[in-house]
Amino acid sequence: MPEAVIVSTARSPIGRAFKGSLKDLRPDDLTATIIQAALAKVPELDPRDIDDLMLGCGLPGGEQGNNLGRIVAVQMGMDHLPGCTITRYCSSSLQTSRMALHAIKAGEGDVFISAGVEMVSRFTKGNSDSLPDTHNPFFAEAEARTAEVAQQEGTTWHDPRKDGLVPDAYIAMGQTAENLARWKGVTRQDMDEFGVRSQNLAEEAIKNGFWEREITPVTLPDGTVVSKDDGPRAGVTLEGVQGLKPVFRPDGLVTAGNCCPLNDGAAAVVIMSDTKARELGLTPLARIVSTGVSGLSPEIMGLGPVEASQQALRRAGLSIDDIDLVEINEAFAAQVIPSYRDLGIPLEKLNVNGGAIAVGHPFGMTGARITGTLINSLQFHDKQFGLETMCVGGGQGMAMVIERLS
């Protein structure tokens, strides 16, 4: 059975939504640029040998609609290349990598592009398609319950299923973070310290050249070249973030200092069978060892990485002690903290260059972005095995184990 190996990665800088460096770019234009950058790193590959372009997008509507994956293929002049657009919210472009892994293992193709994009700046009225009243009335009572809790103080999460009630499948991510923090005993101090850690580590990684190794500079319509992420801030202190006000509840724990912002960006990963890589004379960057995906209550979705990671580790025949570096997407400190604690991950292995609290989280981009970052980190720190994992809106988790090969 062939192995699935990663031969190239590329990503854009990450912009702040609505006010950042990439706000004037279309998602299809940026995605095409980044996929072409990833392909340029493997000139031995004939584009006609690519079996499929699978594009992850958290909210595929508006400019991100119309099967964006296929739009991008045609835009790049590859009419021969099939394209699809996949959403699993925050893990959309980890899902596309999983699909490439499965296709290669099944013998149904040798070369795949797994890419991801999210351009929140291009959303209208807060969502990608701007259509009103699309929620199913089946969840109306659950949504009303969430709204009521959001106005209360001192509320600890209780599983509605225990009362025969339906959970809120549309719950805002910030409310899930508040639920999880209280349910798992995570304090505001814990969260603020983690947020500062992310920013400080990202600042240090910028200084030592880590981030520039993986960023593809992007040229804006006015000719400006963007080569750095908008998010990382120098000199962030605990005292500074402790003064920030809660965002989601009157007595809330989540602030702008301990969660990710809204962002724009795109990333791409070129995945092929090990037999095809040998045929082309390529030395792969990494091998995809295993993946996992989990489901749990939408109201505490942030704990999704735990079961998903346990699945991936079991399938890899590894324990968490065998993993050298871990990347947990930092949607909220409120969910990273209980996830790494439950998994038994030492802090010195976790998000060692900072994470999404600092660099950002464009939903559809993040899966592919973290894959590239993890490979970069395994190379930079000379390590072998890495675990990528994230929580997913709607109450899911996803994970992937990779082994560095070069």
Annotate each PLM feature.
Residues 11-13, 24-33, 44, 152-154, ...:
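N-terminal extracellular/periplasmic Venus flytrap/periplasmic-binding protein-like
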Residues 1-27, 150-156, 163, 239-303, ...:
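Condensing-enzyme catalytic core mediating Claisen C-C bond formation in acyl metabolism
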